[in-house]
Amino acid sequence: MKFYFVEYFILFTYIIISFILACIISLLSYLLTTKKEDPEKTSAYECGFNPFDDTRTTFDVKFYLVAILFFNFCLEISFLFPWSIVLGNISYFGFVAIILFLFILTIGFIYEWKKGALNW
């Protein structure tokens, strides 16, 4: 078994030098910067306006529901892209499986709509 020691040594040396250089640059950046506490820098950014209220307030659950809905439909799209690519090569079972998948997602969306998750 032939080992390629020289090639791996060059790669290993490159990784070590890159890591050391990144650490040195980060350390120099930390040590050489001025650290001034400014209320403008530590406040929450609200589209260019001064913050109206404390940023540590409660967050409405409706936003979480919208985020979960977005995640579900994003996941659905991630399943539909590969299916659309191999559509001509799949069998009848694959076609029925994706139609069943879309049907279950549609039923879930209708259920969320009827429960009022999308009403603000």
UniProtKB/Swiss-Prot annotation:
Q: Cellular component terms, GO, for this chain's entry?
A: mitochondrial membrane; NADH dehydrogenase complex
Q: Which UniProt keywords apply?
A: Electron transport, Membrane, Mitochondrion, NAD, Respiratory chain, Translocase, Transmembrane, Transmembrane helix, Transport, Ubiquinone
Which is an annotated GO molecular function term of this record? Answer: NADH dehydrogenase (ubiquinone) activity
What's the protein's topology in the membrane? Multi-pass membrane protein
Q: Is Transferase there in the keyword field? A: no
TM helices/strands, residue ranges: 8-28, 63-83, 90-110
Source taxonomy: Eukaryota, Rhodophyta, Bangiophyceae, Cyanidiales, Cyanidiaceae
Q: Which PANTHER family match?
A: NADH-UBIQUINONE OXIDOREDUCTASE CHAIN 3
Q: What is its EC number?
A: 7.1.1.2
Query: Catalysed reaction(s)?
Result: a ubiquinone + NADH + 5 H(+)(in) = a ubiquinol + NAD(+) + 4 H(+)(out)
Q: What is its main location?
A: mitochondrion
Which EC class, in a word?
Answer: translocase
| Job description of the protein | Core subunit of the mitochondrial membrane respiratory chain NADH dehydrogenase (Complex I) that is believed to belong to the minimal assembly required for catalysis. Complex I functions in the transfer of electrons from NADH to the respiratory chain. The immediate electron acceptor for the enzyme is believed to be ubiquinone.
Q: What is this protein called?
A: NADH-ubiquinone oxidoreductase chain 3
Of which family is this protein a member?
Belongs to the complex I subunit 3 family.
**Pfam families annotated for this entry?**
Oxidored_q4
Q: What is the residue range of the signal peptide feature?
A: none
Native species of this protein?
A: Cyanidium caldarium
Q: Which domain of life is it from?
A: Eukaryota
Tell where it localizes.
Answer: Mitochondrion membrane
